[in-house]
Amino acid sequence: MLSSSHLPTTIVTPKNVPTLGVLVGGGPAPGINGVIGAVTIEAINNGYRVLGFLEGFQNLILQDDSKIVELTIDSVSRIHFEGGSILKTSRANPTKKQEDLQKVVKQLQKFNVSLLVTIGGDDTAFSSMSVAKAANNEIHVVTLPKTIDNDLPLPYGIPTFGYETAREFGANVVRNLMTDASTASRYFIVVAMGRQAGHLALGIGKSAGSHLTLIPEEFLPTTDSTEPEVTFSRICDMIEASIIKRLYTSKKDHGVIVLAEGLLEYMSTDELKQAFGSSLKYDAHDHIMLAELDFGRLVRDEMRERMNRRGLKIAFTEKNLGYELRCAPPNAFDREYTRDLGNGAVRYLLNGGNGALITVQGVKMVPLSFDDLKDPRTGKTRTRQVDVSSEGFQVAKRYMIRLEKKDFEKEETLKGLAATAKCSVEDFIKQFKYLVQ
């Protein structure tokens, strides 16, 4: 199979021929190579030269001609089976400086690129919008929605490519952890990627049947005037309550808890600084680098301390679930999906289209205008969050182990929970009743 090390090494020179460019921004996701292959084949079959720009916008900003490769049908015809990206990727942000945007446009024009396909998530979509405007629409740009987070503003029920593979891979990991938990009598605290939305954590937890899955959306306010109720103590109270209830109802001292890393995104800066101190780092788009924070370890240590105080002998192990999902070989769904997306992107551009996110809805390719994707408050790409009022989320909750109002209404149950927690009924109510109000 072709890898980035096997790409053509011939130095690319500008040619006065119709040219389409393709680049990848942001983190990897299963299916990137499938898109690159589909775009390349369709463009060449329509008379275009196809250039791949290595490492996203980074080398366009640097105007490094050595980081450009010419793609051929032969070089991409079988790459759709492989994870990763033959064009690599980066998080370089050309919107930080106006001069960087102009460098990108100048470099694209130097190589006669009139059509540009970018593959990425919310930040890449925003950068693509900016490039199209900086080029005065002389370069037509489309973005293909890539992220395992599944948080781009597509219509509900339509995934971003890579999500389905990541969900399947993650659910299989959690299934194995469940067997390990049962065998070794321990709890696993699994932290799944998802900076601003809990789609991946919920998809993994629901399809694997984890005992509790927590995502940021269920803590978000219903009005803009209310602060999110995401605190470290609340998260740990919910986990502790789930463990106590499972121990009371089924006498089981093991299980798997899935947490979305995005829970950290909605905690206050003061709380994050208190928990992580100088280890807080930011990326080129000013996002806290959540993957660099050991959220699972923090929760693990807190739960160990809580159980020890109660005199309960329960073991905990943390597991971060993220990087191993991003470059998994795409499953059949994502291989088919990316072929549709790549083909649709080229056809849209050839028909004069510009400034859109390409989607497949039902049996049709549907472009979504960049302008319609923007959050009017920030000017950046909107985030699609989990709809906690949806039947899908409510079904997921019903199969979790959580405290419910009825647990506090039945005296026998309440006494049993308190006895399991080795505390008085009054203390149990004081600590946990707010979770069901």
Curated annotation (Swiss-Prot):
One of its GO terms (molecular function) is metal ion binding. It catalyses: beta-D-fructose 6-phosphate + diphosphate = beta-D-fructose 1,6-bisphosphate + phosphate + H(+). It comes from Naegleria fowleri. This is Pyrophosphate--fructose 6-phosphate 1-phosphotransferase. The record marks K146 as: Important for catalytic activity. Its EC number is 2.7.1.90. Catalyzes the phosphorylation of D-fructose 6-phosphate, the first committing step of glycolysis. Uses inorganic phosphate (PPi) as phosphoryl donor instead of ATP like common ATP-dependent phosphofructokinases (ATP-PFKs), which renders the reaction reversible, and can thus function both in glycolysis and gluconeogenesis. Consistently, PPi-PFK can replace the enzymes of both the forward (ATP-PFK) and reverse (fructose-bisphosphatase (FBPase)) reactions. PANTHER family: PYROPHOSPHATE--FRUCTOSE 6-PHOSPHATE 1-PHOSPHOTRANSFERASE, PYROPHOSPHATE--FRUCTOSE 6-PHOSPHATE 1-PHOSPHOTRANSFERASE SUBUNIT BETA 2. Its cofactor is Mg(2+); Mn(2+). SUPFAM superfamilies: Phosphofructokinase. The keyword Hydrolase does not apply. Optimum pH is 6 for the forward reaction and 7.5 for the reverse reaction. Belongs to the phosphofructokinase type A (PFKA) family. PPi-dependent PFK group II subfamily. Clade 'Short' sub-subfamily. Keywords: Cytoplasm, Glycolysis, Kinase, Magnesium, Metal-binding, Transferase. The active site is at D149. Activated by AMP. Probably promotes oligomerization of the enzyme. Homotetramer.
